[in-house]
Amino acid sequence: MGTPIKASLLALFLFFLLSPTAFSVSNGGLLRVGLKKRKVDRLDQLRAHGVHMLGNARKDFGFRRTLSDSGSGIVALTNDRDTAYYGEIGIGTPPQNFAVIFDTGSSDLWVPSTKCDTSLACVIHPRYDSGDSSTYKGNGTTASIQYGTGAIVGFYSQDSVEVGDLVVEHQDFIETTEEDDTVFLKSEFDGILGLGFQEISAGKAVPVWYNMVNQGLVEEAVFSFWLNRNVDEEEGGELVFGGVDPNHFRGNHTYVPVTRKGYWQFEMGDVLIGDKSSGFCAGGCAAIADSGTSFFAGPTAIITQINQAIGAKGVLNQQCKTLVGQYGKNMIQMLTSEVQPDKICSHMKLCTFDGAHDVRSMIESVVDKNNDKSSGGEICTFCEMALVRMQNEIKRNETEDNIINHVNEVCDQLPTSSAESIVDCNGISSMPNIAFTIGSKLFEVTPEQYIYKVGEGEAATCISGFTALDIMSPQGPIWILGDMFMGPYHTVFDYGKLRVGFAEAV
């Protein structure tokens, strides 16, 4: 997450306290750190987590095993309604516990510091106190990681880090002194533990995983993820350091070499919609296995093609049309009466701001999900845009029905490629499978796996898991394969042989 890859959706996480932690010792004296799942507002969670982890500075992830008597670590993961997976670590002596996302898309470890006393996001989460640790060593090098419009700022320190039953000594990490409240205030997790390569560290710090290997704490230079996508089950998933758990996959893994150190990046082939080639990536695309991202993200052209095939419509477009349907006729009546146009939206309590914005700023406000909400946010912007079009149509003496139709056309023209897209929940069973060619093998995901269903019955909302992200590289367009892919496919990150492997998860 602290790197040049970026996502477009960013919103608040709903804040719930972490459940009590359960400890148990099993096979070979391995310590299992169990966490409970919370039932939370899944729509807000996926908006928040889904792509704040695809950032100009990036982040997220978590898993399990059946290993030998020693040389491995297991961290039980909490499934936060299919939008984030996190587990518990300890920093210092005695250990101070933190819930962290295990993120293969970044490489730094950071947690809030007791020196962070002005950001609410720090204050409401556990904070690391160097004065309470006998193994703390100062560093002081400043660090910052950008997350879209949010960021963390802090400084490096060094201490022991406990992950499962493994204790990593002399680990550099960031104590945050500032955290963006919009991004982190209501997050379930306290910090992030990066599992990417050192090349993308904000301060070129040696990552936790490197030190596990260098200090001989694991038998194999391998870690693996199993993500349980069944939100109703207690076990959220497991991250295994030092090996894999054969209980959580079927058959053999298909391995592909890492093509660019930094991210866990590899070469991917054609993308199929149903059983038909999309024509994209047939000549090769770069792909990144990223536990810190909920969605699939890829080039706009293919994402648009997929979303059209599944009948997806932009959330912004639908919200705009809903406003027009509910308030359009009243707005027209007010425009033809004596109410000042720039007062109508506030009069209808759709804006808290009395005044007018120019059209350009309105459009930018809609596209920028992190715009200043002091004037009422997106709904206010939709209202102001609709009024501008209505005034023009009234001058042309258009009928009320024609005016409404023309304003709906404006709603259809709002940019949607980087925003959430919704689908008809009743049509999921008829949607096509999407397949990715990796190592000459097809890896399919079903509609049930790439659609988020929020709520039940008539109140249900179904959201496409495909979002646009245009990043060009020397290797070609880049895809991000997040938790929606790593759920169906058990994933192995082989540091020793610099390869990534996928097998059907069970």
UniProtKB/Swiss-Prot annotation:
BP terms from Gene Ontology: lipid metabolic process; proteolysis
Record-linked Pfam families: Asp, SapB_1, SapB_2
Main location: membrane
CDD domains: phytepsin
Organism: Cynara cardunculus
Expression across tissues: Detected in pistils, but not in seeds, bracts, midribs, roots, leaves or stamen extracts. Detected in seeds. In stigmas and styles, detected in the transmitting tissue and in contiguous subepidermal layers at the longitudenal grooves of the stigma (at protein level).
Localization, UniProt: Microsome membrane; Protein storage vacuole; Secreted, Cell wall; Secreted, Extracellular space, Extracellular matrix
Keyword Secreted part of the UniProt annotation: yes
Record GO terms (molecular function): aspartic-type endopeptidase activity
E.C. numbers: 3.4.23.-
Key words, A-Z: Aspartyl protease, Cell wall, Disulfide bond, Endoplasmic reticulum, Extracellular matrix, Glycoprotein, Hydrolase, Membrane, Microsome, Protease, Secreted, Signal, Vacuole, Zymogen
SUPFAM superfamilies reported in the protein's UniProt record: Acid proteases (SSF50630), Saposin (SSF47862)
Enzyme class: hydrolase
Limits of the Saposin B-type domain: 315-417
Entry GO terms, CC: endoplasmic reticulum; extracellular region; membrane; protein storage vacuole
Keyword Membrane among record annotations: yes
Residue positions assigned to the propeptide: 25-70
Signal peptide residues on this chain, from the entry's feature table: 1-24
Subunit architecture: Heterodimer of a light chain and a heavy chain. An intermediate form is produced first, and undergoes proteolytic processing to remove the internal plant-specific insert (PSI) and the propeptide.
Domain of life: Eukaryota
Chain ranges of the Peptidase A1 domain: 85-503
Protein name (database record): Procardosin-B
Entry-linked InterPro entries: Aspartic_peptidase_A1, Aspartic_peptidase_AS, PEPTIDASE_A1, Peptidase_aspartic_dom_sf, Phytepsin, SapB_1, SapB_2, Saposin-like
pH-activity relationship: Optimum pH is 5.0. Active from pH 2.0-7.0.
